[in-house]
Regions:
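Alpha/beta-hydrolase fold active-site loops
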Residues: 100-101, 132, 183
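Structural microenvironment flanking redox-active thiols in thiol-disulfide oxidoreductases
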Residues: 114-155, 165-173, 211, 224
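N-terminal targeting signals for export/organelle localization
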Residues: 1-77, 222-224
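Extracytoplasmic
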Residues: 76-78, 96-98, 129, 156, ...
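Short, low-complexity, Pro/Ser/Thr/Gly-rich segments in the mature regions of secreted, periplasmic
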Residues: 214-223
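Thiol/disulfide oxidoreductase modules built on the thioredoxin-like
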Residues: 153-158, 164-215
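A short beta-strand-turn-helix
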Residues: 70-75, 80-101
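Conserved redox-active cysteine motifs that mediate thiol-disulfide chemistry
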Residues: 97, 105-122
Length: 224
């Protein structure tokens, strides 16, 4: 008698049916998955159309030290991220409406983040004011004093301290495809619309970055 007998004819005939049924279920599952993925894509915001035009105009300035910035190609208003200031008071991203904003998410466990912070601090010192703000949100989920101590020891005193100990800001940006790694920075116009995004560090105090941000601060109708 053979060691591995062939399946009985009836069983053999059922195997393709089982495989076919499994394949059908898999295809249905994939269709559902991709359907959900499409639903999760940001629908866009018609009010942010002007920001896309600005992004197109200033795109040639995204070179050199800021070459990794991806300029906006579709209208997107960022979620109204919620976090706290250094005194524990609740803040929202919309608090800065009326200003051009460089939103930055950072953490002390992120080496590129720590290296980038001095440049962000310098940028705030150079351009920060009534028309522009660096909003750097720390997303450490443990030891709330650690990021404060880091800023103090590094003598970075021009950046205001903001924290999101649940790291929900990162998840909210991830949900709209704008948080792929750390650090993450998003350049926003005065209406909270995306102008450009970068996953990774940049020399934000460089001449290249200053020129890009100054151009972003101009009205949408201005020439560049």
């Amino acid at each position: 008698m053979p060691e591995n007998p062939s399946p009985l004819p009836a069983a053999r005939s059922k195997r393709p049916l089982v495989i076919g049924a499994a394949a059908a279920v898999a295809l249905i599952g994939l269709a559902g998955f991709f359907g959900l993925a499409r639903l999760k894509r940001p629908a866009g915001d018609a009010a942010c159309t002007a920001a896309v035009e600005v992004a197109k105009k200033i795109a040639p300035l995204a070179h050199g030290e800021v070459a990794a910035v991806t300029m906006a190609s579709a209208p997107l208003r960022l979620p109204d991220l919620a976090f706290e200031d250094g005194d524990g008071k609740p803040r929202k991203l919309s608090d800065w409406r009326g200003k051009t904003v460089l939103l930055n998410l950072w953490a002390t466990w992120c080496v590129p983040c720590r290296k980038e912070m001095p440049a962000l601090d310098e940028l705030q010192g150079k351009l920060g004011g009534k028309d522009f703000e660096v909003v750097a949100v720390n997303i450490d989920t443990r030891d709330p004093d650690k990021p404060k101590n880091f800023l103090k020891e590094a003598r970075l005193n021009r950046l205001a301290y903001f924290t999101d100990q649940k790291a929900k800001s990162f998840q909210d940006l991830k949900n709209v495809g704008r948080a792929l790694g750390m650090p993450t920075s998003v350049l926003l116009d005065a209406q909270g619309c995306e102008l450009g995004t970068i996953a990774g560090p940049a020399e934000w105090a460089s001449e290249d970055a200053i020129k890009l941000i100054k151009a972003a601060m101009k009205p949408a109708t201005a020439g560049f």
